[in-house]
A protein has these predicted regions:
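Conserved catalytic core of nucleotide polymerization and phosphodiester-bond processing enzymes
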Residues: 1-169
Length: 169
């Protein structure tokens, strides 16, 4: 919650701790990670000036409520901070999904993509092709940002397998 702009009051309620303890935690967090506070402040300022924010890929996300007053102001600011992060993650998974059919065909894999949930892809794969499919999909997903965006931190992919989605976790 801290990175999404939770208040000391909200954190205290969530953790059932005194408000002054929650405030100290938030203050300490931003002292240890000053770049996060800078990102938050710059993102809010940009959103207020332009009425949108952008993902890493340049996709614009409108922030029409950013000038709101009262309780809506905090919500609008948190939404503006979060939108580039979650929007960029959505862009990455979409780019991966577009590349999946060609990757499966190129590797002659009998797998079938069934579903996407947030940053997860679910496949139906014959047992004999599981390892090769995992390797191919790991390559697709870890390279999904390229060549449009160079990431300083590599994307990493966790993979699981099972007879159903619950077992795969």
């Amino acid at each position: 919650g801290v990175i999404y702009g939770i208040s000391a009051f909200g954190l205290a309620n969530n953790l059932r701790i005194p408000r002054d303890e929650a405030k100290a935690f938030i203050d300490n967090y931003f002292e240890k990670f000053p770049g996060i506070r800078k990102y938050m402040d710059e993102t809010i300022a940009f959103a207020k000036e332009h009425k949108y924010v952008q993902t890493l890929f340049g996709r614009k996300i409108n922030t029409p409520e950013i000038g709101a007053k009262g309780p809506r102001a905090g919500f609008a600011q948190r939404a503006a901070i979060n939108a580039p992060i979650q929007g960029s993650a959505a862009d990455v998974i979409r780019r991966a999904m577009v590349r999946v059919p060609a990757a499966l065909e190129d590797a002659r894999l009998p797998a079938r993509m069934l579903l996407q949930v947030h940053d997860e892809l679910l496949f139906e794969v014959p047992e004999a092709a599981v390892d090769d499919t995992i390797a191919a999909m790991r390559t697709v997903m870890e390279g999904a940002a390229a060549p449009a965006v160079h990431l300083d931190v590599p994307l990493t992919v966790d993979a699981g397998q099972g007879a159903n989605w619950a077992e795969a976790h």
